[in-house]
Amino acid sequence: MTKKQIVAGIIARLEADLALFTAAALHAHHAATHEECQPDNKYDTTALEASYLAQGQANRAREIRQGLDAYRALCLPAFDDESPVRLGALVTLGDETGCERRLFIGPQAGGMKLADVAGDIVVITPASPFGQQLLGLNVGDELQGMEAGKRTAYTVVSVV
């Protein structure tokens, strides 16, 4: 999977999430303002709870829109064996057992997994602790991470 395909996959997933959260926010807003939701007494908080839910859904939709804007504006730099890890890099890490992980350094949507025939690609952001460790490293550099609750040493195998 090329980096352009990765970004296209992220954008498609974010667009689907945006549609879902926008619809959920609209539904929660209608529930909060519906006449049957008006409180019967001072202990009836149904409308208040629905309004909190609507606001949360709207906030999440706004965050997703910001992520979409960031990915649509993302420049995908070319890397070589001397290039340090930075935003837009597809990094392959190897651990001491020989297993490899591929990470895409993106501006948002950290934690998203994209399926590929060569194995999952996980999006991480420069703001994450692991992303902060990766930034500036070169092929052959080592870093420490946590996996399944134990410390694991990784080596940067490639930066594309």
How would you name each of these model-derived features?
Residues M1-G67:
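Helix-rich terminal scaffold detector
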Residues Q5, G9, A16, E100, ...:
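Charged, alpha-helix-enriched surfaces in structured cytosolic catalytic cores
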Residues T97-G98, M146-Y154, V160:
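Short, charged beta-turn/beta-strand-edge "cap" motif at the junction between a beta-strand
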Residues D81-M146:
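Non-DNA-binding regulatory cores of transcription-related proteins
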Residues C37, A73, T155-V157:
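Sparse recognition of residues in long alpha-helices and their boundaries
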Residues Q55, N59-C99:
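Long amphipathic N-terminal alpha/beta scaffold segment
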